Amino acid sequence: MRVLGIDPGLRRTGFGVIDAEGMRLRYVASGTIVVPPALALPERLKVILDNLREVARETRPDVAALEIVFLNTNPASTLLLGQARGAALCALADSALDVHEYTALQIKKAVMGTGRAAKEQVQMMVQRLLSLDGTPAPDSADALACAICHAHVGPLHDKLDRLGTAAQLGSRPRLRNGRLVG
């Protein structure tokens, strides 16, 4: 299974592609889409949309994994991040990819074993899990971690969904007191 992971952002959107065969992971590609801040919002969103379409076309993933937007203390920032996420979702839908969403906590738990890991720790673990020569850039590492999360957790969720028990086990993120919990 080839997984495209995305860490959405209006200034920088990370992407990472891995091949997963059972528990064996192989690095395919990663990068960061840097959006010029001087562009108007619609053009910035188009940069994200066009670049992610191109990544999907070139790497031909089977599925996509996207980090769920966290609730920020600044509502304007949260809305802007949501719009960047929307551009990413449109690119994935246009590429006919199934999209699976994970919280930052779920991603860190899948990669590190704990949801309290620092960004640098996630970068180092991604490097180790994918046998990379160097440490990936922060946005790329987050996207690769999202892809790794889906490679580890996604097949289990799919099996539980087929059995009809996923909702009972609480394996999908849900809202509690206005916050996402996993």
Swiss-Prot record:
Primary location recorded for the protein, binned into one broad class: cytoplasm
Catalytic activity: Endonucleolytic cleavage at a junction such as a reciprocal single-stranded crossover between two homologous DNA duplexes (Holliday junction)
Binding-site residues for Mg(2+) 1, renumbered to this chain: 7, 139
Bound cofactor: record note: Binds 2 Mg(2+) ion per subunit.
Keyword check for Hydrolase: yes
Keyword Oxidoreductase listed: no
An MF annotation (GO) of this entry: magnesium ion binding
Sequence positions that bind Mg(2+) 2: 67
Gene Ontology CC: cytoplasm; Holliday junction resolvase complex
Keyword terms: Cytoplasm, DNA damage, DNA recombination, DNA repair, DNA-binding, Endonuclease, Hydrolase, Magnesium, Metal-binding, Nuclease
Enzyme class of the recorded protein, top EC level: hydrolase
One of the GO biological process terms: DNA repair
Active site: 7, 67, 139
SUPFAM superfamilies: Ribonuclease H-like
Gene3D superfamilies according to UniProt: Ribonuclease H-like superfamily/Ribonuclease H
Entry's EC annotation: 3.1.21.10
Location in the cell: Cytoplasm
InterPro entries (alphabetical): RNaseH-like_sf, RNaseH_sf, X-over_junc_endoDNase_Mg_BS, X-over_junc_endoDNase_RuvC
A Pfam family assignment: RuvC
Necessary cofactors: Mg(2+)
Subunit structure: Homodimer which binds Holliday junction (HJ) DNA. The HJ becomes 2-fold symmetrical on binding to RuvC with unstacked arms; it has a different conformation from HJ DNA in complex with RuvA. In the full resolvosome a probable DNA-RuvA(4)-RuvB(12)-RuvC(2) complex forms which resolves the HJ.
Family statement: Belongs to the RuvC family.
Known function: The RuvA-RuvB-RuvC complex processes Holliday junction (HJ) DNA during genetic recombination and DNA repair. Endonuclease that resolves HJ intermediates. Cleaves cruciform DNA by making single-stranded nicks across the HJ at symmetrical positions within the homologous arms, yielding a 5'-phosphate and a 3'-hydroxyl group; requires a central core of homology in the junction. The consensus cleavage sequence is 5'-(A/T)TT(C/G)-3'. Cleavage occurs on the 3'-side of the TT dinucleotide at the point of strand exchange.
PANTHER family (alphabetical): CROSSOVER JUNCTION ENDODEOXYRIBONUCLEASE RUVC
Protein name per its UniProtKB record: Crossover junction endodeoxyribonuclease RuvC
UniProt source species: Bordetella pertussis (strain Tohama I / ATCC BAA-589 / NCTC 13251)
Gene name in the database record: ruvC
